[in-house]
């Protein structure tokens, strides 16, 4: 999906709450890899962490994260692929999109025009079958006119919430399907992966027919979401890409475009998403990311962000069935 120019009115007709207008990404020349300075630390009378300098870069395209004391948690402290086990919620027969949209992704606000997005959207025709992402028990099947599951009554419209059989590190995991035209299951029913739980619609606060999918960890509430992109099982030969974009002070930069290029075609725009709008949205407990991209073919990529008039480019390798992680520090 290549979109170079967006019109606010057109985008609003596609997505829940609309999406930010991303500028035409700047075409790259031969990318220049920004060298990572070897940090030195001056000891003080009080105990301070001892940081191990990053090794000298090698020809490998896998970046070495530079650890900064101001960021918590540090990137990839444990294998991030540990919870890539949810199936695609859209039926393979669908004529619509089986990939989460990137123009109003998890953590977006549409430039501050809309509520912080706590899930991902799949644009599909009304009536498209929606499938269970995993085995689980239906704990909600109906609408949210009386019981609030989001910001307000009738926020999701017709919805289904599953408590999944499989837990993550002993913690309960929930999947929420919103804006359904029809609910096909009943509360208390057990479903298997791939079972149809509903049909795509636009009930509740929705513009255009689409599925809104959320992943909730620990508790079934609006404040316990995680980015579903980092829970979806990649297709064969694909992986997932995530990253963290930091400003000169080591703080996450909110809601800026992140552009991806294949390393073999550094001047050809491939895909684009954006960083999370605010720290109020939950990042992955392991990664601490502020952007993520699903269903990425295994290979080498260049990731570009632009802050002011300066561009920053970092390489990253995505391996099949795993999460590639890139950290971009926009220090001047």
Protein language model regions, located:
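Short, acidic Ser/Thr/Gly-rich low-complexity loop/linker segments typical of extracellular
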Residues: 264-290
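Acidic, glycine-anchored pre-beta loop/turn
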Residues: 128, 183-195
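Surface-exposed, glycine-biased beta-strand/turn segments
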Residues: 67-159, 163-167, 193, 202, ...
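Beta-strand-rich domain onsets/edges
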Residues: 114, 128, 204-207, 211-212, ...
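Hydrophobic core positions of the immunoglobulin-like beta-sandwich fold
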Residues: 177, 292-294
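Ser/Thr-rich, Proline-interspersed low-complexity disordered segments
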Residues: 19-91
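Sec-dependent N-terminal signal peptides
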Residues: 1-23
